Amino acid sequence: MDHDHMHDMPPPSPSSSSMSNHTTPHMMMMHMTFFWGKNTEVLFSGWPGTSSGMYALCLIVIFLLAVIAEWLAHSPILRVSGSTNRAAGLAQTAVYTLKTGLSYLVMLAVMSFNAGVFIVAIAGYGVGFFLFGSTTFKKPSDDQKTAELLPPSSGCVC
């Protein structure tokens, strides 16, 4: 392979990180492992900052985002089937899109690698599932009541 034509090309420019080894005072270091502490950035630059109150608010917001995402995931709007109504389809699409967006926001918050954010995200999803997805607070439908009265199947397809 002929590489003679490459001698006219300028050398690659050094990256900004190799040009200086110092960081500016307003930039925070991004963690690549889990860490404990309130001094973090979650979702937005400078939020929650270094304030304990703002960190607590951040944890509450992440918890609520996870609970709402679970509520939307188990919403009756998403379970409507057999309808060919376009309005119902648009409503399902809107709810699904909102749920997916909230889930991605929670995922991005967890990517801050702050252990507190991780714990409240998992707790939010767990509480959301317990309240809206588990059978704890659901009334069984008529089909479920009938199925509970029948003896368990033996697995035989005779």
Swiss-Prot record:
GO terms for cellular component: membrane. It comes from the Eukaryota. Highly expressed in leaves and at lower levels in roots, stems and flowers. Keywords: Copper, Copper transport, Ion transport, Membrane, Transmembrane, Transmembrane helix, Transport. GO terms for molecular function: high-affinity copper ion transmembrane transporter activity. Induction: By copper deficiency. Down-regulated by treatment with high concentrations of copper. It is a multi-pass membrane protein. The keyword Zinc does not apply. The chain crosses the membrane at residues 53-73, 104-124. It holds the Pfam family Ctr. It is found in: Membrane. Residues 1-20 are annotated as: Disordered. One of its GO terms (biological process) is copper ion import across plasma membrane. Disulfide bonds: none annotated. The keyword Translocase does not apply. Belongs to the copper transporter (Ctr) (TC 1.A.56) family. SLC31A subfamily. Involved in the transport of copper. This is Copper transporter 2. The gene is COPT2.
